[in-house]
Amino acid sequence: PHLHWGEISPHQVWHASACIGKDDDVEHFHRELAWREFSHHLLYHFPELPRRNFNRKFDRFPWGDDKDLLACWQSGKTGIPIVDAGMRELWQTGYMHNRVRMIVASFLTKNLLLHWHHGQDWFWDCLADANLANNSASWQWVAGCGVDAAPYFRIFNPVTQGQKFDSTGEYTRAFVPELDRMPDRFLFNP
């Protein structure tokens, strides 16, 4: 929130974190800070970003509009453990790790084929750190229609993502307690 309210500048954050050293975590943090600034630049120069595809050729994409699928995604009841954990964490805490944000966004847009606006609007309503510029640019990135988008055919496989980033199942089980007794080898295989 300190960046959001201008209590500290991105330059100050960059410099202070650079003084820590040059490890992978600092470099990753700098990339995220740069993405934040890039997103703000985009929104300033393209104020329609929250409502229109940056890449206009996606305006004709045949998005679905299944309200039941959207409700399942929003409530964390898709049957896909890592997706359900992320969506329940979002609802319960107002937070979600960036990797899980990408997984649930990819699932909404690439697996359920629901318009990225639905996800953007839900994140805006639920995230404690909601930011219009980041939210809009990130959703378009995942959906494949943004300025620096992931290719439309890039899909985050929620099964392998769960196995890779929650290999012990600790995160998933924390938010999907009905899977507490599920053996690890079956946890991410819906």
Please report, for each region that a protein language model flagged, where it lies by residue.
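C-terminal catalytic domain of photolyase/cryptochrome flavoproteins
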Residues: 1-190
